[in-house]
């Protein structure tokens, strides 16, 4: 796990039982809990995010959540940033703990591991810069119809600056241009599922209680947010976890 991300998600050495973090989470929401955890680190000169983060506990929790929700014969798409500031050995250990037998990866900006390690690549049925999936039930009144949905680590190219302005330049070549299709993405660590346009859904862990998102949940979200309006609420963006 990324040290800053692990701290923001409540996996810390100074609150190992999540007591204070969870109390804030339940009473004031995730943003308040994140701000508290980050503040503890920044206010203590003896700490930094690497010292404060319990990255092993973070990774164990993510693996446990996936195994609890995703079946052996399901298709699991991981939309990037699978491993960062960790060894490929640890990455492979986490992936091998997943009971799902059909793993697919979309490459994120922290995924250099796939270039150099064939055994890690072999754990996936596919690894692509961007991909598509056929999902059922997204259209209103067409419960059996399938629809092609784009899969990317990044929001649409036109929306990169909506969160972190530098992304519009840094990741322009990697992000897909808007083509009218719905998009599932990660990358932003925002706390809400809403994208910068109604066709985009953030399926990152921070917006979904650190749990994978099912096809049914995706369909339900798009049904609940079906609109012709061009207005989108401002995204609740955290500080960037780093380059």
Which positions does each model-derived feature cover?
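Core catalytic region of metal-dependent phosphoesterases/phosphodiesterases
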Residues: 4-139
């Amino acid at each position: 796990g990324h040290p800053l991300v692990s701290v923001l998600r409540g996996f810390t050495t100074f609150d190992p039982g999540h007591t204070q973090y969870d109390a804030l989470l339940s009473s004031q929401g995730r943003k308040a809990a994140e701000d508290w955890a980050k503040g503890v680190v920044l206010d203590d000169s003896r700490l930094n995010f690497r010292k404060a983060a319990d990255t092993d506990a973070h990774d164990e929790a993510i693996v446990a959540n996936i195994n609890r929700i995703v079946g052996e014969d399901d298709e699991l798409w991981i939309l990037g940033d699978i491993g960062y500031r960790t060894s490929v050995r640890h990455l492979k250990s986490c992936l091998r703990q997943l009971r799902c037998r059909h793993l697919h990866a979309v490459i994120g900006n922290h995924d250099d591991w796939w270039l150099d390690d064939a055994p890690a690549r072999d754990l996936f049925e596919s690894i692509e810069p961007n991909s598509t999936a056929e999902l059922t039930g997204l259209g209103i009144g067409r419960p059996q119809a399938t629809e092609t949905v784009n899969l990317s680590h990044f929001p649409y190219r036109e929306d990169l600056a909506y969160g972190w302005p530098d992304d519009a330049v840094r990741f322009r070549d990697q992000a897909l241009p808007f083509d009218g299709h719905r998009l599932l993405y990660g990358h932003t660590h925002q706390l809400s599922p809403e994208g910068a346009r109604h066709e985009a859904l953030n399926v990152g862990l921070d917006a979904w209680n650190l749990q994978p998102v099912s096809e049914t949940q995706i369909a339900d979200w798009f049904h609940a947010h079906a609109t012709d309006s061009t207005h989108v609420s401002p995204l609740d963006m955290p500080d960037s976890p780093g380059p």
